[in-house]
From Swiss-Prot:
The gene is ATP8B3. ATP binds at D495, K496, T497, E596, F637, K660, R693, T763, G764, D765, R913, K919, N942, D943. One of its GO terms (cellular component) is plasma membrane. SUPFAM superfamilies: Calcium ATPase, transduction domain A, Calcium ATPase, transmembrane domain M, HAD-like, Metal cation-transporting ATPase, ATP-binding domain N. It catalyses: ATP + H2O + phospholipidSide 1 = ADP + phosphate + phospholipidSide 2; a 1,2-diacyl-sn-glycero-3-phospho-L-serine(out) + ATP + H2O = a 1,2-diacyl-sn-glycero-3-phospho-L-serine(in) + ADP + phosphate + H(+). This is Phospholipid-transporting ATPase IK. Belongs to the cation transport ATPase (P-type) (TC 3.A.3) family. Type IV subfamily. Its EC number is 7.6.2.1. Residues 1-149, 198-381, 453-995, 1049-1078, 1136-1141, 1208-1300 are cytoplasmic. Its main location: membrane.
Length: 1300
């Protein structure tokens, strides 16, 4: 590997040699597969060969290395090439040392034996047991046929309003206290429950459909002696599965064999960790050799003993017991569910974990019931209203008691009217008033809100501007109850790969000898026809065209140009796949990373074609001439070296060292710094400005005597070549690769940042790649100070010393901050990441936490400084001391809070190398300590847990895999659509629902508080003022349509203005449109309206001698009702800002319904049918026929409207006009001060920012040099040097003893 020893030729290398190979294509007879204590094992006649050409390259004849059997060690250790064995961070291989170690493993699986695996049980509760091993069926839906009704009712009655209505319905069913018909509340309640249940059922049916699509995917399972086509849901633990190229792995499986050499298997894990580069997995050598036929696979009875299912994506320890021998297993032998098989024709695996036991499903988390901030606020407001109604009812009940007592005292001769005691009658009147005033919390408001949420969701589905035509993906609201949350988002947590980027890397530009070549270069003239017709190996998909560069290549005019392309064709780990029969001249490259594939393809198009490789040779075609280079050593990429080097011998005999890597390490090792080097630096700076991913190329010729000396003595290259600064003689140039972003990503992020939304990128990819994308999408900028581990430690030290004072305002105003951290550092820093998620639910008061730690302040600060020193020197993180568990928990909370506070003060946060569980816990931490609305967006299975944890989850469709979509609340086709989803639909939904709630509370109080004032004048008897039909139809017809229009169509600004002025989005983040204060204002406004309507009518009704006189209850009720209806109609007219014909129609229809229904219910013919049901006979006509009464109604409406009109329209307009006049009088203002540009913080010795980013995976060089990865090779192989020839690689070089 890159940090370990490089390789020496086999003739000079001490130690054991690799294992033997099976016969080559031309061999006959039995293969060389052997087992300890047995002779050669061939393939018997009649057996079907499932693996052709498997094994190591021919000519490798030494037996495999084994540990000798020792007493008490009944196991076998198998040698195989050392390489990376984890997906994200390199997992450390853990071999089992003795039998006692196996006792810690609780998971035991036997191959091809379902009966054996099915006997294991686990206790659930009491005596109830179930099968220990889960099936491979995935269920993300919340309900099934039996659980839907009870579970849905249980969830619905978590709403306080539903409980309130249920209590009122129960009280209403008691005849002695009921003041309204039983069906007046029970019918709306049933409708409300039915509507919400239907909505939940539709949402859950979509989940069931997605689950069926996944569970019904086809796979091949070994049944008996053949593989049969089955479904994913039919898989069981212990089954042997056959996977083909491009198949998705259906469960966590132990790799048994593959058609690749040495049973390698290449997998793409972009759906798990977001990395685009390929990773390799390798089967055990024993299964690779022995399981070569279907018959042998069917008779395989090996037993795997391993750790129980867990969420650690990069860790696995176990052993395989087979034929009385044991073989250790690690993550490098495991294929995880969700991976996609790449560049491997066929592989075979043994299912270890299935279904919800798989690692990816362990990281997915549980389905949470998401509630919006307004929904939670409504629960609290319902409690407040209920308590207020109870208090009012108590006051009215006491008033009734005093009234009855006074009546009995003054009218003792009518004592029979009140036969019961005063207390008993007051008790019953209390409940009567409670039922009468229960409509203060109108059930119709909750019913209409369901239609409003549904309608706004439909508008999202219908928005053609969020339709992604290339992949036919429309926007979709999978959850219909979170629309207003879209207008309150403060934090966005985004995946990188597939979310911000397209996963497409293209060769964009290059710089050779200080001259830039590329599509945008002045020297570039785009040809009218294909310039690569002369090259039969050219890839027509490459879009890089440069006529001047092509002319230099074809005329051999510049040696540096030839060396440039020669380096790209030689210095890599790419393999050549077999060409299709119909196109024998077409080369198929197998690249470990898209970066290397793009570089080798570019060299191929310019005439330097990589043809093939063996263990110690590379064959390329240079402008039609085939040349073979002998590979003497390969030094692979790693995170420390940041470069790859290849030492080759040219056909002419000269030895040359080719190196490509980061500019920061290449320039430090140049022989000289001339004009060409400075020109290359300028080109790199320009490439960095364009956010291209760059690599520098350099080489040097190595003298024969130096190489021979190195070969014989195995000394470090830094000692041999003496001068580190002169290790590379000549700089060839630089390459620039474009990691294409999705369309509109930079503009979207810029707009969202203006909306006061903080964007965090959480990715499993490497840090260099993530930072490069951060600059490309303008999340990071050159004037930002990027904080990494050391800076974070220093700042947190200040936090602890200053007692919860993280950063001063002065320090924040000086520079913009960005945070870049990795998952390992988060694991050390945040205690919650090492605990169960329920630890995040523990709330510790911050003041109490500091008080707990105040007693041991000195020791605490000393321990914190010690912890920081431990971090700096790479030692385990020291935890602050605590006297007891509570103090320890307090310190943990403070440590978490410090990190969240620091991150929240940064302009951008990028978390690299994080697991799916870490993504979710980061989101949970922000929610815990900042109580803000969070949104998570991603496209892969590794984003599911994050999407579920966030308040709003958005899944991107159209990428590989739909698991993120199935667990999301909203579906988009591209990241750029998030801008319109939040700023337009989210903001509109928030504005609409807030205006709807405010208006509904206002009109409810305006209409219902009249009952209270009326009770003060009727002896507190509980007699309703209004006609019964007015109460029944008020929220159904008379006032519903305008408020429904507000909830569905209201727009305070247009969609274009919402996008042009993203600052308007802040109103939702600050809860400005509906909060406790707005609620109090609405209630107060409704109370004042009811006072005006009631007492104005009461005042005119006392004028019994005037022309507007009326003294009957019915006329009084009609006048109050009419005043109330017109007042709330004027209020809705003032609220609406988006006027359309539909808006006018809803207002006219509401008034028309009132006129028609009032005339009908108070007509003579209905009175004749049922006088008790329709008692208001011609009351409307007596009111409408009196101009004086109508004038009183108009006066009441005017008194209610004019103050509101002045506050909302006249005063703001005058204030704005006055501000404009003052601005004109003052004239153009001069700048009092100018903001100086922020100083650029240089993290390197040079001022230029390095845009190096390479997604290559460490370990492929060893596979090549050991022959593990090769199908064919020469008759005599040679291992690569065991020491690094890279003269600057002190850490990679090794001594002779180490190589042995």
């Amino acid at each position: 590997m890159g940090t370990g020893p490089a390789q020496t030729p086999r003739s000079t290398r001490a130690g054991p040699e690799p294992s033997p190979a099976p016969p080559g294509p031309g061999d006959t007879g039995d293969s060389d597969v052997t087992q300890e204590g047995s002779g050669p094992a061939g393939i018997r006649g009649g057996e079907t060969v499932i693996r052709a050409g498997m094994g190591d390259s021919p000519g490798r004849g030494a037996p495999e290395r084994r540990h000798k059997a020792q007493p008490g060690r009944a196991r076998k250790y198998e040698w195989r090439p050392e390489g990376p064995t984890s997906m994200g961070s390199l997992g450390q291989r853990e071999d089992l040392q003795d039998e006692d170690r196996n006792s810690a493993f609780t998971w035991k699986v036997q191959a091809n034996n379902r009966a054996y695996n099915g006997q294991f049980k686990e206790k659930v509760i009491l005596c109830w047991q179930r099968k220990k091993y889960k099936t491979n069926v995935i269920r993300t839906a919340k309900y099934n046929f039996y659980s839907f009704l009870p579970l849905n009712l249980y969830e619905q009655f978590h709403r306080v309003s539903n409980l309130f209505f249920l209590i009122i319905i129960i009280l209403q069913s008691i005849p002695d206290i009921s003041t309204l018909p039983w069906f007046s509340l029970s019918t709306p309640m049933v409708c409300l429950l039915f509507i919400r249940a239907t909505r939940d059922l539709v949402d859950d049916m979509g989940r069931h459909k997605s689950d069926r699509a996944i569970n019904n995917r086809p796979c091949q399972i070994l049944m008996g002696k053949s593989f049969k086509q089955k479904k994913w849901q039919d898989l069981c633990v212990g089954d042997v599965v056959c996977l083909r190229k491009d198949n998705i792995v259906p469960a966590d499986m132990l790799l048994l064999a593959s058609t690749e050499p040495s049973s390698l298997c290449y997998v793409e894990t972009v759906d798990i960790d977001g990395e685009t580069n390929l990773k390799f997995r390798q089967a055990l050598m024993v299964t690779h050799k022995e399981l070569a036929t279907i018959k042998k696979m069917a008779s395989f009875q090996g037993t795997v003993t391993c750790e129980a299912p867990n969420s650690r994506m990069h860790h696995f320890v176990g052993c395989l017991e087979w034929n009385d021998k044991k073989y250790s297993l690690d993550i490098g032998n495991l294929l995880l569910r969700g991976c996609r098989i790449r560049n491997t024709d066929t592989c075979y695996g043994l299912v270890i974990y299935a279904g919800f036991d798989t690692k990816i499903m362990k990281n997915c988390g549980k389905i949470h019931l998401k509630r919006t901030k307004l929904d939670l606020l409504m629960n609290k407001l319902v409690v407040v209203i209920f308590i207020s109604v109870v208090l009012v009812c108590l006051v009215l009940a006491f008033g009734f008691g005093f009234s009855v007592k006074e009546f009995k005292d003054h009218h003792y001769y009518l004592s029979g009217v009140h036969g019961s005691s005063v207390a008993a009658e007051s008790f019953f009147v209390f409940w009567s008033f409670l039922i009468l005033l229960s409509v203060t919390i109108p059930m119709s408001m909750f019913i209409l809100s369901e239609f409003i949420y549904l309608g706004n969701s439909v508008f999202i589905d219908w928005d053609v501007q969020m339709y992604y035509k290339p992949q036919d993906v429309p926007a979709k609201a999978r959850s219909t109850s979170l629309n207003d949350h879209l207008g309150q988002v403060e934090y966005i947590f985004s995946d990188k790969t597939g979310t911000l980027t397209q996963n497409i890397l293209t060769f964009n530009k290059c710089c050779i000898s200080g001259r830039v070549y590329g599509p945008d270069s002045e020297a570039t003239t785009r040809p009218k026809e294909n310039p690569y017709l002369w090259n039969k190996f050219a890839d027509g998909k490459l879009l890089f065209h440069n006529a001047a560069l092509l002319h230099l290549v074809r005329t051999n005019g510049d040696e540096a140009v030839r060396e440039f392309w020669r380096l790209l064709a030689i210095c890599h780990t790419v393999m050549v796949r077999e060409s299709p029969r119909e196109r024998p001249d077409q080369l198929l490259y197998q690249a470990a990373s898209p970066d290397e594939g793009a570089l080798v393809t570019a060299a191929r198009n310019f005439g330097y074609v990589f043809l093939s490789r063996t263990q110690d040779t590379v064959t390329i075609m240079e402008l039609g001439e085939e040349r073979v280079y002998q590979v003497l050593a390969i030094m692979d990429f790693n995170s420390t070296r940041k470069r790859m080097s290849v030492l080759v011998r040219k056909p002419e005999g000269a030895i040359c060292l080719y190196t490509k890597g980061a500019d920061t390490v290449i320039f430090e090792r140049l022989h000289r710094r001339g004009a060409m080097e400075f020109a290359t630096e300028e080109a790199l700076a320009a490439f960095a400005q364009e956010t291209l991913r760059t690599l520098c190329l350099a080489y040097r010729e190595v003298a024969e005597d130096i190489y021979e000396d190195w070969q014989q003595r195995h000394q470090e290259a830094s000692l041999l070549l003496q001068n580190r600064a002169q290790a590379l003689q000549q700089l060839l140039g630089a390459t620039a690769i474009e990691d294409r972003l999705q369309d509109g990503v930079p503009e979207t992020i810029k707009c969202l940042k203006k909306s006061n939304i903080k964007i965090w990128v959480l990715t499993g990819d490497k840090q260099e790649t993530a930072v490069n994308i951060g600059f490309a999408c303008e999340l990071l900028s050159e004037n930002m100070l990027i904080l990494e581990e050391k800076e974070i430690s220093r700042i947190l030290e200040t936090y602890w010393e200053n007692s919860n004072n993280l950063l001063t305002r002065e320090s924040l105003s000086q520079v913009k901050l960005a945070l870049v951290i990795n998952g390992d550092f988060l694991d050390k820093l945040l205690v919650s990441l090492r605990k169960e998620p329920r630890a995040l639910a523990q709330n510790v008061n911050m003041d109490e936490a500091w008080q707990e730690l105040g007693q041991s302040r000195r020791d605490f600060l000393y321990a914190r400084r010690l912890s920081l020193l431990c971090r700096r020197f790479g030692l385990p993180l020291a935890a602050p001391p605590a006297q007891d568990s509570r103090a320890r928990r307090s310190s943990e909370v403070l440590q978490e809070r410090a990190f969240v506070d620091l991150a929240s003060k940064c302009q951008a946060v990028i978390c690299c190398r994080v697991t799916p569980k870490q993504k979710a816990l980061i989101v949970a931490l922000v929610k815990k300590y900042h109580q803000v609305v969070t949104l998570a967006i991603g496209d892969g299975a590794n984003d599911i847990n994050m999407i579920k944890t966030a308040d709003v989850g958005v899944g991107l469709a159209g990428q590989e895999g739909m698991q993120a979509v199935q667990n999301s609340d909203f579906v988009l086709g591209q990241f750029c659509f998030l801008q319109r989803l939040l700023l337009v639909h989210g903001r509109w939904s928030y504005v609409r629902i807030c205006k709807f709630l405010r208006y509904f509370f206002y009109k409810s109080m305006a209409s219902m508080m009249v009952q209270v004032w009326f009770a003060c004048y009727n002896g507190f008897t509980g007699q309703p003022l209004y006609e019964g039909w007015f109460l029944a139809l008020f929220n159904l017809l008379y006032s519903t349509l305008p408020v429904l229009y507000i909830g569905l169509f209201e727009q305070d600004v247009s969609a274009e203005q919402s996008l042009e002025k993203p600052e308007l989005y802040v109103v939702g983040q600050k809860d400005e449109l509906f909060n406790y204060w707005v609620f109090v204002q609405a209630i107060a406004h409704g109370v004042t309206t009811s006072l005006v309507n009631f007492f104005m009518t009461l005042w005119i009704s006392r004028d019994t001698a005037g022309p507007a006189s009326f003294s009957d209850h019915q006329s009084f009720a009609v006048v109050v009702a009419l005043s109330c209806l017109l007042s709330i109609t004027m209020e809705v007219i003032l609220i609406i800002k988006y006027w359309t014909a539909l808006c006018v129609a809803t207002i006219l229809l509401s008034l028309g319904f009132y006129a028609i229904m009032t005339t009908t219910t108070q007509s003579f013919w209905l009175f004749r049918v049922s006088p008790t049901t329709f008692p208001f006979l011609y009351a409307d006509l007596s009111v409408m026929s009196s101009p004086s009464i109508l004038l009183v109604v108009l006066l009441s409406v005017s008194i209610n409207t004019f103050p509101v009109l002045a506050l909302r329209v006249i005063f703001p307009a005058l204030k704005e006009l006055r501000a404009k006049e003052e601005k004109v009088e003052e004239g153009p203002s001069e700048e009092i001060f100018t903001m100086e540009p922020l100083p650029h913080v240089h993290r390197e010795s040079r001022a230029r920012r390095s845009s190096y980013a390479f997604s290559h995976r460490e370990g492929y060089a060893n596979l090549i040099t050991q022959g593990t990865i090769l199908r064919r090779g020469p008759g005599v192989s040679s291992d690569i040097a065991s020491e690094s020839l890279d003269p600057s690689d002190e850490e990679a070089a090794s001594s002779p003893k180490e190589s042995q």
